[in-house]
Regions:
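Active-site residues of response regulator receiver
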Residues: 56, 86
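Conserved acidic segment of CheY-like receiver
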Residues: 3-17, 22-23, 53
Length: 153
């Protein structure tokens, strides 16, 4: 069966345990790159396009809001691929994050199935050239074709 290129996720979070968990949840469907803080995330965003950006807002400077501001200034369309995954947001912070026209927001601790569904939805709605919907559809079609061939033999 031909290989299907996985969408690439940039995970920007300073918590190593969170990064390990999210990577484990996503590894089957996505390639995950990790940026350990906002500055590292901004540097990666300057040089590469990602299908989905998972962003923690509560990090040492620069925080996640600085990353959102960078995207708003340099390529507003990429905000649609941002899924904020963060803890203990106040109502004003939540409103501020949503004002950036992000794909979604999930609180920590999170349900792993809800996270996976949200990341897939962000990949589809981001509008980039490699939406997960097309990738998964292609993979499903190829798998079905293999199953049909196996039954006919």
């Amino acid at each position: 069966m031909p290989s299907v290129e996985k969408p690439v996720v940039l995970l920007i979070d300073d918590n190593e345990a969170t990064c390990t968990l999210i990577t484990a949840v996503l590894h089957r469907d996505f390639l995950v790159e990790i940026a350990a803080d906002g500055q590292d995330g901004i540097e990666r965003l300057r040089t590469k396009r990602y299908d989905v950006i998972i962003l923690d807002l509560r990090m040492p400077q620069p925080d996640g809001f600085a990353v959102l501001e960078f995207l708003e200034q340099h390529d507003k369309r990429r905000l649609r691929s941002v899924l904020v995954v963060t803890a203990a947001l106040t109502a004003p912070e939540m409103a501020r994050a949503k004002a950036f026209d992000i794909c979604g927001l999930i609180g920590k601790p999170f349900d792993v199935d809800a996270l996976l569904d949200a990341v897939k939805q962000c990949a589809v709605s981001s509008g980039d050239g490699n939406p997960i919907g097309n990738v998964l559809s292609s993979g499903v079609i190829l798998l079905l074709a293999d199953l049909i061939r196996a039954r006919l033999m």
